[in-house]
């Protein structure tokens, strides 16, 4: 079964690129948003402390504050990048997730999309999905990268996106350390001899990291290593570990011991978050996140057999979707309206 791709024409230049791009890929009836912004200091403290800027638990939201997607369902795009000391945001996305909530049933879920999944990027043809943020940023629009990613997901998966949150993973370390570390139940031994460890004298240096099974306390550096390592297992296992780490961050952030740490968390957040959500929407998310029962959140990774490995003519290794297998998963997570 092949999904029909709805591909808009290439974006034009100018300040309205983001709205034009999203409007072309969005189905009738979905709302529009303004450009990216940073949370104010006081609000960032609340948002970060509740884990909202980091994970797919951005799901229990007052429905009146967010536009409707599929039959009132709310879908948020969650992105992680590694700026490696840079100041811009035009980098390939290292983590791509879609968080979803049905406000009527309170059913929630997180979909992890592999960064090497090849899809049609509106206006740019077939390429890995993690390149969309770079292509969109080439339009001289700071909000263009996430806009193109949203359009790509909408065009290929038929999932309307209501907003995005993007975080720099280097600040992720600081956030975990500010929380005093997190507890992770490591299920499988992990040994990676080629974990990237760039240095000024050798930007391509590696180091060895190792995790034994069992409950472990991790600081920011260890948590990031555990979430991002891919050489000893697979990119799909990596996506599952990322979801576990994000759940652990939320658990710690919601603890009473985290309350005195909120001001410092806010300071870390100011330079590490981009979002197109309005201030009142962020506040609604923060106030509602604590009510979510994390044990009931569906966690899905697009992995084999939902996708299969392929080598392109240029030698690049990518993953290709099996829509006949993916569609039932999307229906279960997002509702029947996503399959047309």
Regions found by a protein language model. Give the residues of each.
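Non-catalytic, solvent-exposed segments at the cell envelope interface
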Residues: 2-340
């Amino acid at each position: 079964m092949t999904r029909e791709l709805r591909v808009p024409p290439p974006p034009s230049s100018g300040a309205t690129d983001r709205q034009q791009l999203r409007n072309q890929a969005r189905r009738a009836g979905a709302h529009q948003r303004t450009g990216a912004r940073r949370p104010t200091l006081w609000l960032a403290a609340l948002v970060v402390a509740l884990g909202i800027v980091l994970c797919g638990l951005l799901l229990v939201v007052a429905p009146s504050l967010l536009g409707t997607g599929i039959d009132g369902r709310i879908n948020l795009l969650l992105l992680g990048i590694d700026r490696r000391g840079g100041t811009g945001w035009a980098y390939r996305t290292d983590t791509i997730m879609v968080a979803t909530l049905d406000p009527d049933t309170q059913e929630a879920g997180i979909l992890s999309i592999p960064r090497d999944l090849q899809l049609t990027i509106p206006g740019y043809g077939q390429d890995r999905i993690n390149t969309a943020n770079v292509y969109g940023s080439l339009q001289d629009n700071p909000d263009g990268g996430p806009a193109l990613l949203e359009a790509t997901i909408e065009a290929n998966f038929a999932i309307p996106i209501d907003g995005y949150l993007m975080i720099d993973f280097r600040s992720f370390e600081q956030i975990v350390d500010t929380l005093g570390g997190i507890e992770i139940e490591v299920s499988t031994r992990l040994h990676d001899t080629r974990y990237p460890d760039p240095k000024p004298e050798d930007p391509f240096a590696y180091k060895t990291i190792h995790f034994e099974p069992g409950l472990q306390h991790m600081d920011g550096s260890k948590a990031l290593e555990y979430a991002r390592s891919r050489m000893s297992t697979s990119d799909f296992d990596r996506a599952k570990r990322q979801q576990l780490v994000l759940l652990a961050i939320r658990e710690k952030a919601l603890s009473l011991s985290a309350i005195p740490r909120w001001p410092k968390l806010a300071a870390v957040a100011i330079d590490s978050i981009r979002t197109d959500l309005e201030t009142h929407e962020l506040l609604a998310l923060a106030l509602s996140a604590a009510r979510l029962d994390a044990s009931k959140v569906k966690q899905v990774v697009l992995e084999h057999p939902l996708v299969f490995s392929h080598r392109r003519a240029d030698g690049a290794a990518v993953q290709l979707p099996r829509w006949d297998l993916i569609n039932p998963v999307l229906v279960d997570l997002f509702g029947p309206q996503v399959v047309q």
